[in-house]
């Protein structure tokens, strides 16, 4: 029987999979999710942690015998028993099928729809509507499968049920209001059956289903961003002007003493995003630019793209300090399933994480399964491609063709508008918009 420690951050739905599986199998799993034992964004970046888990990702599991494994599905499998994994080769294959389905088909649209309502991702109306329809399709697929079944595989709970329930959890809690979910009675029955099992309740507690579909809250999104010092300082400076000089001085001293407070207000995920390691700035050799990228990103995240963010972009764009580029994936014939194509974009963005302060991009997947393409518009600091400035940034860029754009041309104006808004004819592509991702 497995026994060990699970490193994660609080309320991580991916960690729930292993914890529920352990409730069924009897595996002894200790959870470290809060300081001083585990500080997400700090502990998982230490040399000691990275020696055990090179990716630095959580959840991560360390067995009492020294065995280490990361990735939530692998951990859940490890702490499970034969019954959860599938007691026959056929059942085991079906369990893997549903676990894979959850990651490939449910996670992308669920994230696109739910994350903006939680204030952790930019909202795009068209993308959200597409995600809603995809979720509707998925719930319908599950509903048909569960019409004559109590559980996804066999007659008892397996890892298939645990994984799919955890993947659907935030949908049911945040956006699947009664009028939306009522069309899927079999899926609802199965979901409620699972979450009310003692083993699920021991981990999830009482799950309250959504009563009213949550909407994107621009204020919540702005507050959730790690870069929020500037607005606070501006607000503070306006308030300071209204105070007498002596009182302002006293207030400044109090603020200095309370310097750590803003970081304490961030949740664990935000602290990880904010905790960038100190390194030499590859763009330090460039002259100062009048274009403030962070301000544009705030406009893009919190205001209407077409009427506010785009006019701001062109009004403030510094053509000497920044450059625009069009990229296109070189090997469209290798693109098969759209979720896999989307993962190419996500993976590239993750590997370019330290470039975010000096770049912005909208990359779009066009088309359908086995007939798709990837292209995007990028805004880089400087006049050359940024990738050669750091070996960390050179993994993916050679898989794309790059063409520098003329900021003053009509073609560039159209490309920027269509790619930043995720709306338009996209005549140069010849395929319909599927989904997009923003690098910011």
From Swiss-Prot:
One of its GO terms (cellular component) is nucleus. The modification N-acetylalanine is found at residue 2. Residues 2-87 form the GST N-terminal domain. One of its GO terms (molecular function) is translation elongation factor activity. The modification N6-acetyllysine is found at residues 147, 212, 404, 437. It comes from the Eukaryota. Keywords: Acetylation, Elongation factor, Isopeptide bond, Protein biosynthesis, Ubl conjugation. Residues 88-216 form the GST C-terminal domain. Residues 279-440 form the EF-1-gamma C-terminal domain. Pfam families: EF1G, GST_C, GST_N. The modification N6-malonyllysine is found at residue 437. There is a cross-link at residue 288 (Glycyl lysine isopeptide (Lys-Gly) (interchain with G-Cter in SUMO2)). SUPFAM superfamilies: eEF1-gamma domain, GST C-terminal domain-like, Thioredoxin-like. Residues 221-257 have a biased composition (Basic and acidic residues). GO terms for biological process: translational elongation. There is a cross-link at residue 256 (Glycyl lysine isopeptide (Lys-Gly) (interchain with G-Cter in SUMO1)). Residues 221-267 are annotated as: Disordered. EF-1 is composed of four subunits: alpha, beta, delta, and gamma. Probably plays a role in anchoring the complex to other cellular components. This is Elongation factor 1-gamma. The gene is EEF1G.
């Amino acid at each position: 029987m497995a026994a060990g420690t699970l490193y994660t951050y609080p309320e991580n739905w991916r960690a729930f999979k292993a914890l529920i599986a352990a409730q069924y199998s009897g595996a002894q799993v200790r959870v470290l999710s809060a300081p001083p034992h585990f500080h997400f964004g700090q502990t998982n970046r230490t040399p000691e942690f990275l020696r055990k888990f090179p990716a630095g990702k959580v959840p991560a599991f360390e067995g009492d015998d020294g065995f280490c494994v990361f990735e939530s599905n692998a951990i859940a499998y490890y702490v499970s028993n034969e019954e959860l994994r599938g007691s026959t080769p056929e059942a085991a294959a079906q369990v893997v099928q549903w676990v894979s389905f959850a990651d490939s088909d449910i996670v992308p649209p669920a994230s696109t729809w739910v994350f903006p309502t939680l204030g952790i991702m930019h909202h795009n109306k068209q993308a959200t509507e597409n995600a809603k329809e995809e979720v509707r399709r998925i719930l319908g697929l599950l509903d048909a499968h569960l019409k004559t079944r109590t559980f996804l595989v066999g007659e008892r709970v397996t890892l298939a049920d645990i994984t799919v329930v955890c993947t659907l959890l935030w949908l049911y809690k945040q956006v699947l209001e009664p009028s939306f979910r009522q069309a899927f009675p079999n899926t609802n029955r199965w979901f409620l059956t699972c979450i009310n099992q003692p083993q699920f309740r021991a981990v999830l507690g009482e799950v309250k289903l959504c009563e009213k579909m949550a909407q994107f809250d621009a204020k919540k999104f702005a507050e959730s961003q790690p870069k929020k010092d500037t607005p606070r300082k501006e607000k503070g400076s306006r308030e300071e002007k209204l105070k007498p000089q002596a009182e302002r001085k006293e207030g400044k001293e109090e603020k200095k003493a309370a310097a750590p407070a803003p970081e304490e207000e961030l949740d664990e995920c935000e602290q990880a995003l904010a905790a960038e390691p100190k390194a030499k700035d590859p763009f330090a050799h460039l002259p100062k630019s009048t274009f403030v990228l962070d301000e544009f990103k705030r406009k893009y995240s919190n205001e209407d793209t077409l009427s506010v963010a785009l006019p701001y972009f062109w009004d403030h764009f510094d053509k000497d300090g920044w450059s625009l580029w069009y990229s296109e994936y070189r090997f469209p014939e290798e693109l098969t399933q759209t979720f896999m194509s989307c993962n190419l974009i996500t993976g590239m963005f993750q590997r370019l994480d330290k470039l975010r302060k000096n770049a912005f991009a909208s990359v779009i997947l066009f088309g359908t399964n086995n007939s798709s393409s990837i292209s995007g518009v990028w805004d880089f600091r400087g006049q050359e491609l940024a990738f050669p400035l750091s070996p960390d940034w050179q993994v993916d860029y050679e898989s794309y063709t790059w063409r520098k754009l003329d900021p003053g041309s009509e073609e560039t104006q159209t490309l920027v508008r269509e790619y930043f808004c995720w709306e338009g004819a996209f005549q140069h592509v010849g395929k319909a918009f599927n989904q997009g991702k923003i690098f910011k």
